[in-house]
Amino acid sequence: MGEKRKTRQAEVNIGMVGHVDHGKTTLTKALTGVWTDTHSEELRRGITIKIGFADAEIRRCSNCGRYSTSPICPYCGHETEFIRRVSFIDSPGHEALMTTMLAGASLMDGAILVIAANEPCPRPQTREHLMALQIIGQKNIIIAQNKIELVDKEKALENYRQIKEFIKGTVAENAPIIPISALHGANIDVLVKAIEEFIPTPKRDSNKPPKMLVLRSFDVNKPGTPPEKLVGGVLGGSIVQGKLKVGDEIEIRPGVPYEEHGRIKYEPITTEIVSLQAGGQFVEEAYPGGLVGIGTKLDPYLTKGDLMAGNVVGKPGKLPPVWTDLRLEVHLLERVVGTEQELNVEPIKRKEVLLLNVGTARTMGLVTALGKDEIELKLQIPVCAEPGERVAISRQIGSRWRLIGYGIIKE
């Protein structure tokens, strides 16, 4: 058991989504013991800016049968049995950070929509995050009605009715609604049981060519490190298919920017995996699920400060195409989501600049042609993606980018 435990990798990614300050990070801490806001600005402002990952083990008590994430049952003190390891992706709920949430959404196998019981439902980002889940086609959703310690029974029931009304006709229509207090750990066992029942581990084919979406990239060298001690750049993200091994040669697309005749172009790069980290451990092989860190031979200058975020990693010659222009079959929403007042979505116009989220990448696209339910765009930064993939489309309204629909990449 001890040996197996050492190398356990999370097998499913669960997004924590919802309006700013409704308790996503507190709930992640209640489930995992990890406070995911570690960015200095996050601690100062009390909101999540970057995407945080934290793992937890889903366990069941062999004595009382209750679920928890702890080796010893918090309810009766007996040992618990390991079921599976899951990874929580804590997304920003602040409206200015919606595009960051969409990048994380592309890695989610399920989601917990956190809704505070002490505020009217829905709040703007509650609506926006649910729409984001709908756009990416995510149906494995649980609703955590949080902060029930702040309201009386009547208020909690009124809020429950508002939630039921809000989810009618959406992908979350049949989602279980679980009242909890993340702060006091109340009803967390019921939530963990719901995760086990409603967010299954997807069937994955490890024989497919590996593909990893890069969410973060780092230079882990401290200033003043002597040259012989420098280590290569690190890529952080999630494997969506296949597996990666230490020693593998990998290609990164669209790669790194360079200038040619005054224009910025991108060139794919190849490197070797020198180390792999999953679940906080160094491993020889990594699979889909959880955050994976790849140590490479890349110049750390290329990976510092998330410069490689939005790239796709795989075996050389096996990755999807890189697009500098996209043709999309467009599906627009009726109304703009995320704004306090309801606005109708205007049709897309020629020469309009839209923000596109493609996997973990985001890029601006200039609309060059319009057809019936189709548009063509010239991209500011190229993207690596499969034909048929979904792309979230946002438009600038006022000073913010607002989700207005999605597109499907056409050949």
Curated annotation (Swiss-Prot):
GO BP term, example: formation of translation preinitiation complex
Binding site for Zn(2+): C61, C64, C73, C76
InterPro entries according to UniProt: EFTu-like_2, eIF2G, eIF2g_C, eIF2g_dom_2, eIF2g_GTP-bd, P-loop_NTPase, Small_GTP-bd, T_Tr_GTP-bd_dom
Binding site for Mg(2+) 2: D21, G46
Chain segments carrying region G2: 46-50
GO cellular component, one term: cytosol
Enzyme class, spelled out: hydrolase
Protein keywords: GTP-binding, Hydrolase, Initiation factor, Magnesium, Metal-binding, Nucleotide-binding, Protein biosynthesis, Zinc
Claim: Protein biosynthesis is one of the keywords in the record: yes
All residue ranges annotated as the tr-type G domain in the record: 9-203
Region (G3): 90-93
Region (G5): 181-183
EC number(s) given by UniProt: 3.6.5.3
CDD domains referenced in this protein's UniProt entry, alphabetically: eIF2_gamma, eIF2_gamma_II, eIF2_gamma_III
Domain of life: Archaea
Pfam families per UniProt: eIF2_C (PF09173), GTP_EFTU (PF00009), GTP_EFTU_D2 (PF03144)
Molecular function per GO: GTP binding; GTPase activity; metal ion binding; translation elongation factor activity; translation initiation factor activity; tRNA binding
Entry binding sites for Mg(2+) 1: T25, T48
Known function: eIF-2 functions in the early steps of protein synthesis by forming a ternary complex with GTP and initiator tRNA.
Cited HAMAP family: eIF_2_gamma
Protein family per UniProt: Belongs to the TRAFAC class translation factor GTPase superfamily. Classic translation factor GTPase family. EIF2G subfamily.
PANTHER family: EUKARYOTIC TRANSLATION INITIATION FACTOR 2 SUBUNIT 3 FAMILY MEMBER, EUKARYOTIC TRANSLATION INITIATION FACTOR 2 SUBUNIT 3-RELATED
Protein name: Translation initiation factor 2 subunit gamma
